[in-house]
Every structure is written in C-alpha cells, then in structure tokens.
Curated annotation (Swiss-Prot):
It comes from Thermoplasma volcanium (strain ATCC 51530 / DSM 4299 / JCM 9571 / NBRC 15438 / GSS1). It is found in: Cytoplasm. The keyword RNA-binding applies. It catalyses: tRNA(Thr) + L-threonine + ATP = L-threonyl-tRNA(Thr) + AMP + diphosphate + H(+). PANTHER family: THREONINE--TRNA LIGASE, CHLOROPLASTIC_MITOCHONDRIAL 2, THREONINE-TRNA LIGASE. Residues 1-49 form the TGS domain. This is Threonine--tRNA ligase.
C-alpha cells in the first residue's frame, strides 16, 4: 500500500479512520469524497490535506458556498446561480440588485460570523422531484436540475443555507479561516444576454500568511498592469471610439515590437525557417475549405463586395501559408518546408471581453507552419522546443516553464477529425467529424473511428519531450479538433503562469487541401502540418514582458536606452556631443538640454524607464567621461568609448541584467 494511503473498513466513516484535522476529504481513485461518507467496502483511500492542490480547490469551492450563504442572509431576495472555483479564487453569480463596496464589506463580515460559528456542512441526496421542490423559487437552479439531473443528486447544507452541488466540501465552515472578497462585476446570464447578474469574486487560502502574500502580489500586479505601464511609457493607443479592441503602437511601442520581431527572425533563420507574407483578406471559399468558417464564423469579419463575392478578414494565418506551399509539387527530400510570418489576424470579441494587449480584436502572431513527413515529427518537435527554451531564456532570463500535452478524448470521437472504417464493407474515409458518420460506398452507419494516426503523432510528441528531459502533464480532451498539441507556460515575477507557445500537429488540413509529396517509392503520400507560435502573439507577449519586468525591460528592448542630462547649461553642448556619439553607435538615446535641474529631469523621465541615465558636468567634459546611473540608482564614471563598448555589448548579447 502506498505510504499516503489509509485503510478503511467497510461501514467506517472516513473521518473516524483518519482522525487528522489537516485532512478535509479523501480521494478514492479519481473520485473525491467527504469525510462524513461511509466506506461501502474495505478499501484504501488517499487523504486530501487542506494545504494540497486538491485541498485548496475544495477549500475555495466551500468558500463560494460560504459567500452565497452570507449573501442570502443579508439579501433574502438574491437568487444564487452558480459559483465555481477559478484560477486563484472563486466567484458566485446572483440575480439581485447591484451592490456597493460597502455591501461587499458587510458580506465579508457575515462570512466571518458564519466561520466563527463553525457550522457543520452536510451532504444529502434527493430525487429530481425533491430537488425541484427544494429550489422551486430559484429558476436558475431549476434549469440546472432539469438539464443535469436524471435520477438523484446531492445538495450541501450549512445552517439555513442549502445549495445544489456534487461536492466535496470541507467538514465545517470553521475550516475557511483565510479568505477575502476581491471585487464586484456584472455578468451576462448565458441563457439570456439581456439578464445581468451580480458577480462577486473572492479568494481563500489554507492560512493567513498565504492569503497575505497573495494580496500583496495583487497590489503589486495593479502597479505592474501593462495598461498602466503602456500609458506611462507611451507605448500604444487604445481608442474605444474609433478602434475598439484594435491597439495602435506609438513610436516607443513599435520599437519593442520590432525588436521582438527582429529576434524571432534571427531564431527562425538559424533553424531553417523562411519568411513569407500573406494578405489580410481572402475569399470565404478558403475559410470554408480550411474548416475555419464553420468553427470561427461568429468571430470573423465577413463582407460581400459589389460583384457578389464574399470575403473574410483572416482569423488565422495557416490557409495563406498552405496556399504558398501548394504552388508546386514536392519530393520526400524537399521536406520539411518551413514558413514563418509575423501575421496579423482579426477575431471579433464582445466588447466586455476586450482588454489591453492581452485580449485585443487584432493581434500579430509569430506564426509558423512546417510541412513535414510523419517520420519527421520527433525531430521537428525537438527543434521547436529548443527554440522555445532559447527564446524564453534570452528574453526573460532564468524563468520557470511548464509544458502541457493536450490529447484526444477517445470517449468522444465526434469532437475530432478522424478517419473512419466501415465495419460492413471495409471502406476507409478520412477527415470526418460528427456523430452520424455514413459510409459513402455502402451507406452504412456502422463506422469505427481509427485512432492510429492520432496515437502515432501523440506518441512522437511524448518521445520528443521525454528525450529532452521535459516534464509535462497530459490533458485528455484538450486537443484541438485536428490534432494533439503542446502548450508552454511561463511563471512571471509574481508567480503567475502565462500560456505562451503552442506547437500543434495537424493531419487533417492537408486532407482538406490535398497536400502531398512523392515518397521514396514514387507514391503520393500526405504531408503533416505543424502549426507553431513561440511568442504566441506579440501583443500578449509584450503585455507579459511589461508586467514581468514592471516596465524595466532589458536594454535591447527598451525604447530609450540612454537619457543624457547636462548638470547645467554650460555643459549642454557636451551633453549633445555625448548623445550624438551614442546615436552614431546605434544606441537609442535622448538628450534633455533644457533649463530644469538634474533631479527634476530624472523625476520627469522616471515613468519612461530608460535603461541608463547619463549625467555630464564640468568634470566629465574636462575628462571626456560620462557618469552613468543604472536603474538601481547606482552611479559609475566611464570613459566615453568605454561606456559605448559596455552598452553595445549588453545590447548585442541581449542581456537581461544591466552591465553594473
């Protein structure tokens, strides 16, 4: 028996078998159970501790119920809808009148009162008819019951509050000691967009220390919000009247964008990628053939020209790259063919979902598509993962990365493009998706999905990561409908995980477009496409960079690399000479030779976050030197040529830290 398992006898309550107040539930196989449940047989279960990942989820789930309990105590007319656990916390939606920050404080105090009472939380099972009676005054719960309950289901009760829920929960409200309500928002009811619900966000942790650390990080995150930094550094314009959701880059912002593109061009070039360009608009026939029309139509910008032809602004770059690849025939020796493009795509998002650079309606991807043989998958995936590691290490420095492998859910083949084999006539059909597949030869519906292509590609992705010593998690059912994929996340300076890179295998777009090559035996064989984006998108990547570095970007990315200040007007000419030397050396430099004091000039330029402030006075002019101040406030005097070499070296190496 594993060391973390506990033996429980038939008829024994889990709580009695464990008798450890740090344990809040048990896990039996893949199922979580309340401590008050009784073992149906002699069995081994795993204890779920409050401070574990699973324990934190259960704690926050219980905190959401605690929130609903407090709200309905204070606002009896409020109708609870749903209250899920989300990243870093939870929320609950209510049909009620809008509330204020003052109300939020009162709700939190009521939650604390219920916690202090240490109310037991009990699980009870009812039939569907009984559930409909219990929640007869709440149309939101009635809908959930009618859509999800067939025979019986569970509710959880704490004092006078009862909620529909599968559980599990902490044993009593006294376990929810460290929590905080964070904000109020408006949420649209998914079944009726005219109905606005009140959404209350909160978080909970196993202890006050963890909660305090999280709240401190939240405050720091507000200071690092990329939208705030963008305004301070004058990087982009967001105009809700003329271009809602379409960011426009200022000269400063375009510098960062161009440097990122330049670096990706370098990484692409040394790994065999060639640059292409594709238009922003295509006839809708290409989107229908690619499958994007069916999947993305609600998010596409579509229009009809006077001649009657229908067009769509591209939501993806891949069909354009496919059109370029399809211009000629290929031998097996020609593959892989790798196309890359900083391609801008356009996707409609509801106005309430658009925000800053992380959720725009137009964004530029460092998009790449390679056309390969099936036997090349492992090698090419390893190359791509190497590009990911090199890129993130260069840009962020020593940063934690996490890798996810999204695979097919074989229990639901209808969600994926698959090959099917007719059990009656043996005919094989490629690239079908749906629930009622018909054989085009004998018209039988007795069709078996063939997972072999998916299995082969998925195993090659595993092999690639295993051979590189990469630890990864697998997520069944998270694959795209046309193939398995790898997602790469990074952890920023505040400990937040951000999904950036995607490496996606695609077997079925080659079927849609008839993409083949001639193999070594002279026969036509289908190519495989790998879609990849290392940054993800330049917009999102820039937002994460700004927040990670709090706007103090590495010098090679910083719009103003040096800011030259004369001590007085007598040294203004020397300051201009120093600035020209920097500009001539390719350094992005600005001189402020105005009449303000040095301290005032430094204060004025603070929000622009230059890499170095160069101060020159009479002594520097006499000695042909410069006094350089770094971002930490440390100053050092260099000869002019010496400083030029130092900063040029820092930029050329794309160093994350400063030279001193």
């Amino acid at each position: 028996m594993p060391i973390n398992e506990i033996r429980v006898q038939k008829g024994q309550r889990y709580r009695d078998a464990i008798n450890d107040k740090k344990v809040i539930a048990v896990k039996k196989g893949d199922k979580f159970l309340d401590l008050d449940e009784i073992a149906g047989e002699d069995e081994a279960v795993q204890p779920v501790y409050l401070d574990s990942e699973d324990g934190l989820y259960i704690l926050r789930h219980s905190a959401a119920h605690l929130l609903a309990n407090a709200v309905t105590n204070l606002f009896p007319e409020a109708l609870p809808n749903t209250g899920p656990v989300v990243e870093n916390g939870f929320y609950y939606d209510f049909d009620m009148k809008p509330i204020t920050e003052e109300d939020l404080s009162k709700i939190e105090e009521e939650m604390k009162r219920i916690v202090k009472e240490n109310v037991p939380i009990r699980r009870m099972i009812y039939s569907k008819d009984e559930l409909l009676k219990i929640f007869s005054k709440n149309p939101y719960k009635i809908r959930i019951i009618n859509e999800n309950v067939e025979g019986k289901s569970s509710v959880y009760q704490q004092g006078n509050f009862v909620d529909l829920c599968l559980g599990p929960h902490v044993p009593s409200t006294g376990y929810i000691k460290a929590f905080k309500l964070l904000s109020i928002a408006s949420a649209v009811y998914k079944y009726d967009e005219s109905k606005n619900l009140v959404r209350i966000y909160g978080t909970a942790f196993p202890d006050e220390k963890s909660l305090r650390r999280y709240l401190e990080n939240l405050e720091e995150a507000k200071k690092r919000d990329h939208r705030k930094i963008i305004a301070e550094m004058d990087l982009a314009v967001f105009n809700s009247e003329w271009a809602p959701g379409f960011p426009m880059y200022t000269p400063n912002g375009q510098i960062i964008r161009k440097e990122l593109i330049k670096y990706m061009d370098y990484v692409n070039g040394k790994n065999g990628w060639t640059d292409v360009w594709t238009p922003h608009v295509f006839k809708d026939t290409i989107w229908k053939q690619s499958g994007h029309y069916a999947k993305y139509k609600p998010n596409m910008y579509l229009f009809v020209l006077p001649d009657g032809d229908s067009y769509g602004i591209k939501p993806m770059n891949c069909p354009g790259h496919i059109a370029i690849f399809a211009r000629r025939k290929y031998s097996y020796r020609d593959l892989p063919v790798k196309y890359s493009e900083p391609g801008t795509v356009y996707r409609y998002e509801k106005s309430g979902e658009v925000g800053g650079l992380t959720r725009p309606r137009a964004f530029t991807q460092d998009d790449g598509h390679e056309f390969i043989r099936m036997d090349q998958i492992v090698g090419e995936i390893k190359t791509l993962l190497g590009m990911v590691r090199e890129t993130f290490t260069t840009v962020f420095g020593n940063i934690e990365m996490a890798f996810d492998l999204s695979v097919i859910d074989k229990e639901h083949p209808e969600n994926y493009l698959l090959s099917y084999v007719c059990k009656d006539c043996g005919n094989r059909v490629e690239g079908l998706r749906g629930t009622d597949i018909e054989c085009p030869v004998c018209h039988s519906h007795n069709m078996d999905p063939d997972f072999s292509t998916w299995d082969n590609a998925t195993e090659q992705l595993r092999q690639a990561m295993d051979s590189m010593g990469i630890t990864y998690k697998e997520y069944p059912g998270e694959a795209a409908f046309y193939g398995p994929k790898i997602d790469v996340h990074v952890k920023d300076a505040l400990g937040r995980m951000w999904q950036l890179s995607t490496i996606q295998v695609d077997f079925f777009m080659p079927i849609n477009f008839g993409l083949t090559y001639t193999n070594s035996e002279g026969k036509e064989e289908r190519v495989v496409i790998i879609h990849r984006a290392i940054y993800g998108s330049y917009e999102r990547f820039m937002a994460i960079l700004l927040e990670h570095f709090a706007g103090k970007l590495p010098t090679w990315l910083t719009p103003i690399q040096t800011y030259v200040i004369p001590v007085g007007t007598a040294n203004a000419e020397y300051a201009r000479k120093v600035n020209k030397s920097l500009l001539d050396a390719g350094i992005r430099s600005v001189v402020d030779d105005g009449p303000d004091t040095v301290s005032k000039k430094i204060k004025m330029i603070h929000d622009q976050r230059p890499s170095y402030i160069v101060v020159v006075g009479a002594k520097e002019e006499q000695d042909n030197t410069v006094t350089v101040r770094n971002r930490a406030g440390k100053s050092k005097t260099y000869g002019m040529n010496e400083f030029l070499e130092i900063i040029k070296n820092e930029i050329e190496k794309r160093s994350v830290g400063q030279a001193f």
